[in-house]
Amino acid sequence: MASRTKGTTTIEVGADGVAVITLINPPVNSLSFDVLYSLKSNYEEALSRNDVKAIVVTGAKGKFSGGFDISGFGEIQKGTMKEPKVGYISIDILTDLLEAAKKPSVAAIDGLALGGGLELSMACHARISAPGAQLGLPELQLGVIPGFGGTQRLPRLVGLTKALEMILTSKPVKAEEGHSLGLIDAVVPPAELLNAARRWALDIAERRKPWVSSVLKTDKLPPLGEAREILKFAKDQTRRQAPNMKHPLMCLEAVEVGIVSGSRAGLEKEAQVGSEVINLDTTKGLIHVFFSQRGTTKVPGVTDRGLVPRKINKVAIIGGGLMGSGIATALILSNYSVILKEVNEKFLEAGIGRVKANLQSRVKKGKMSKEKFEKTMSLLKGSLDYESFRDVDMVIEAVIENISLKQQIFADLEKYCPQHCILASNTSTIDLNKIGERTKSQDRIIGAHFFSPAHVMPLLEIVRTNHTSAQVIVDLLDVGKKIRKTPVVVGNCTGFAVNRMFFPYTQAAMFLVEHGTDPYLIDKAVSKFGMPMGPFRLCDLVGFGVAIATATQFIENFPERTYKSMIIPLMQEDKRAGEATRKGFYLYDDRRKAKPDPEIKNYIDKARSVSGAKPDPKLEKLSEKEIIEMTFFPVVNEACRVFAEGIAVKAADLDIAGIFGMGFPPYRGGIMFWADSIGSKYIYSKLEEWSKAYGEFFKPCAFLAERGSKGAPLSAPLEQSRSRL
């Protein structure tokens, strides 16, 4: 977790009698405790000086503030920093000092005012913004609540319904919308921002403009009965959408107290709740994810060598299927010029059609204008040969999983592409060293493993071979960030990080079913745990062909610890293939709505007769907690192997990979963080117990056995670096 950020504020008093207080804490002027204490000191100075008539608060270098520096929460959780007394910042500083001051203050907002930054601006008596500035309260997605008065001031400025929408979704609005809502008093060009704010502040001081304390406003609040109905609806919706998280409901309680009992009581409730949520397990998990996600681009021995990413102007994609067209979509959406290559006109037309459909979907949803659609599509060109590859900076191969085909493609690429060109493969199953065997360019061969649909899913696994150069990794990390993916650098192995970690997930579920557990109870328990869907619903979604192909590679590579179930092959024999055929583990209606299928029992019985498995009375009566343990502890076990083998540099990278690649619930912090919250000793003892009862599939690996026997954290760094990176 990041160390405590130092920051400050400056004060400058002009001849006009306006004190300009500037927030300084690069890169986004986050409100660390240092900044807040400095703000208080400079405010007190401005209020005590006779030559100051009014105050303007602004941020350095074109950004107002990105919000509270949440590394402070981490320090408080670890006990390395003392928490200020409850309400000190929100009540003592922002309300009783700043908002209640005898001199008016105006916030001059440029770039962004998020979280505590927006809350600080709402405590000012007016807000002037440059066009396009982002305004929002994203705290809930970090596991905390708006704790600097946001639960009280935002409803009073924009109305209760809009305030709840902004708080619960964490979605910002732009300055122009903020102006129409009443959150912003005026939008002015950036060059005029500071002078406009100074004039506005003086106009308030001289009573030419209204002196508004937003915490006292009531004109935007609905009648009490209506407000209670709105809040009840919001609470019901929150319980449905976030059943495992307490902090959104706690936030709504603070809003409600302010509506019912007045803003002062609301501020006190907000301060109390804000102090309590810091120690929730879900908050610890979400804050861990926040920092871990930002840490994936720091790769020891790669990103600490002073290498600068080279400019990638033109990218070629080989293969216009679902994956290739999705990758092309992601690239052109970020203004990369893309060549899409196919083997014939029919396939090329289909590939370009898929890209077009992906963009048209955005137009229909109002996320893209027709003009932007045309401009974006103009970045895509089709090709049937390699002639147009002579000036590309990167190629991403996305053809079928056929090793000889891929080897031929990479041998051809070496002939046509310039020497600096990065040669990437989107393979999910084939050893990258084998793909590059026929080339002399193994230092520029790298895995760029996207997840389907590639233009939507946020993870990019960057797979390094023993030969890949650090420069190529740095380049691909930069591309990943520019196309708005979370890139994670991993080593070359079967399944890489995500598929390797999670292959025991479905196999454990199959094992349980063959030994007596109801598949629909497993799916229900796993969904309640927080996964997007259970393992059987997931098999239906991806299709049985993909499920069998994926399982086969692990059975071939790790025969000693795989569970080979015949349930899916037997279903395939009867032309069941999952959701695509409307029959899999579930039956699907015209709207693709799933319902349990009583016929599944027949396939389970047949599979038992093949494997020799028999229902186990213990496994027939598993609780939801036991289902989760027997499904996910094997995943923890495999994650430990991946970490111990050096496939990942940090355990936190595996947390991020599981969250963004498999949908592991972020509020649980990721697979390794979750495991440590349970305790390695307990996980080791359960796996040991099951391995004795049910076989090698559950046997704890040496790394887990070593740490579990001592009760040591699984995510602690390896004593000696065994990283393949």
Swiss-Prot record:
Reactions this protein catalyses: a (3S)-3-hydroxyacyl-CoA = a (2E)-enoyl-CoA + H2O; a 4-saturated-(3S)-3-hydroxyacyl-CoA = a (3E)-enoyl-CoA + H2O; a (3Z)-enoyl-CoA = a 4-saturated (2E)-enoyl-CoA; a (3E)-enoyl-CoA = a 4-saturated (2E)-enoyl-CoA
CDD domains reported in the protein's UniProt record: crotonase-like
EC assignment: 4.2.1.17, 5.1.2.3, 5.3.3.8, 1.1.1.35
Pathway: Lipid metabolism; fatty acid beta-oxidation
Annotated motif Microbody targeting signal, positions: 723-725
Example of a GO biological process term: fatty acid beta-oxidation
InterPro entries: 3-OHacyl-CoA_DH_CS, 3-OHacyl-CoA_DH_NAD-bd, 3HC_DH_C, 6-PGluconate_DH-like_C_sf, ClpP/crotonase-like_dom_sf, Enoyl-CoA_hyd/isom_CS, Enoyl-CoA_hydra/iso, NAD(P)-bd_dom_sf
Keyword NAD part of the UniProt annotation: yes
Gene3D superfamilies: 1.10.1040.50, 2-enoyl-CoA Hydratase, Chain A, domain 1 (3.90.226.10), NAD(P)-binding Rossmann-like Domain (3.40.50.720)
Catalytic residues (UniProt): 119, 139
Recorded GO CC terms: glyoxysome
GO terms for MF: 3-hydroxyacyl-CoA dehydratase activity; 3-hydroxyacyl-CoA dehydrogenase activity; 3-hydroxybutyryl-CoA epimerase activity; delta(3)-delta(2)-enoyl-CoA isomerase activity; enoyl-CoA hydratase activity; NAD+ binding
Annotated keywords: Fatty acid metabolism, Glyoxysome, Isomerase, Lipid metabolism, Lyase, Multifunctional enzyme, NAD, Oxidoreductase, Peroxisome
Source taxon at top rank: Eukaryota
Compartment(s) where it occurs, according to its Swiss-Prot or TrEMBL record: Glyoxysome
Keyword rRNA-binding: no
Family under the similarity heading: In the N-terminal section; belongs to the enoyl-CoA hydratase/isomerase family. In the central section; belongs to the 3-hydroxyacyl-CoA dehydrogenase family.
Notes on the domains: The epimerase and isomerase activities are contained in the N-terminal region while the dehydrogenase activity is in the C-terminal region.
Protein name, UniProt field: Glyoxysomal fatty acid beta-oxidation multifunctional protein MFP-a
Organism: Brassica napus
Lineage: Eukaryota, Viridiplantae, Streptophyta, Embryophyta, Tracheophyta
